[in-house]
From Swiss-Prot:
This is Putative pterin-4-alpha-carbinolamine dehydratase. Belongs to the pterin-4-alpha-carbinolamine dehydratase family. The keyword Lyase applies. The keyword RNA-binding does not apply. Keywords: Lyase. GO terms for molecular function: 4-alpha-hydroxytetrahydrobiopterin dehydratase activity. Pfam families: Pterin_4a (PF01329). It catalyses: (4aS,6R)-4a-hydroxy-L-erythro-5,6,7,8-tetrahydrobiopterin = (6R)-L-erythro-6,7-dihydrobiopterin + H2O. NCBIfam families: PRK00823.1-2. GO terms for biological process: tetrahydrobiopterin biosynthetic process. Its EC number is 4.2.1.96.
Amino acid sequence: MPRLSVQEIDQALKGLRNWRFENGELVKEFKFADFDSSIRFLNMVQPVADSLDHHPDLCVYYNRVIVHLTTHDEGGVTDLDLKLAQKLDELEKMVH
């Protein structure tokens, strides 16, 4: 899957909630009510990431989960990152 241009990424970000393009990655901070909700979200992410064979970098801080998406093989953001970002936004709704 080819790496997207900055212009393509900027256009795609218009359709995503609170994602940003930073240091060559898509980044979003998900905020939840508590630690249990954060872990519930993580447990929902795993099968989705496995189904796409595309795994995000995740940092957990009590009620926050920071997600970094990039396609390492392509050296930047691809359509696969955008697809996973959309799916993570859908999962977020299920936790709240």
